[in-house]
Amino acid sequence: NTPAAEQAPARPKSRYIPALDGLRTLAVVAVVLYHLNLTWAQGGLLGVTIFFVLSGYLITRLLLNEVAKTGRIDLKSFWIRRIRRLVPAVVTVVVVTCALCTIFNHVMLTKMRPDILPSLLFFNNWWQIAQNVSYFNALGDPSPLTHFWSLAIEEQFYLVWPPLLLAMVSMHMSKPKTRRVVLGLAAV
């Protein structure tokens, strides 16, 4: 041991998990192959499931780290961070899509107009259900905002999961019991 090595501060433990980048890459490839309508890539929708599982894992890990550091989950701060992270990108995509449709495809703009608010407010999945629209059976030219269904589901997860996790943490359940409850909720 050199004196410099002994004096160097310990590096904080990284929250970054490189293997998850590999999973993300596989998920992206699966989704892209699915959308290319390749007969041998029918399982590509599994990529969306991978994204959902990764998001659930990472958000749970983030919230449990907060509990370990502070002893609580600050729901308001969590939701504000999600809004600050996602809303600018969502608004940008919707505005740019509207602008491009206005310039290049006015018919598509008319078609997507009812999808704008559900996309901006993260209930596009419920909107599609109410309109009897099947994302998976969409023929012809679906709305360019149709894909927002998956982001809507993720945002709804962000609304529901943190309070449930907070309730479990507040009940001081043992790890085995917590695992059983989480698996039960996941099954639902």
Model-derived regions: residue spans:
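Membrane-interface helix/loop caps of multi-pass membrane proteins
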Residues: 1-188
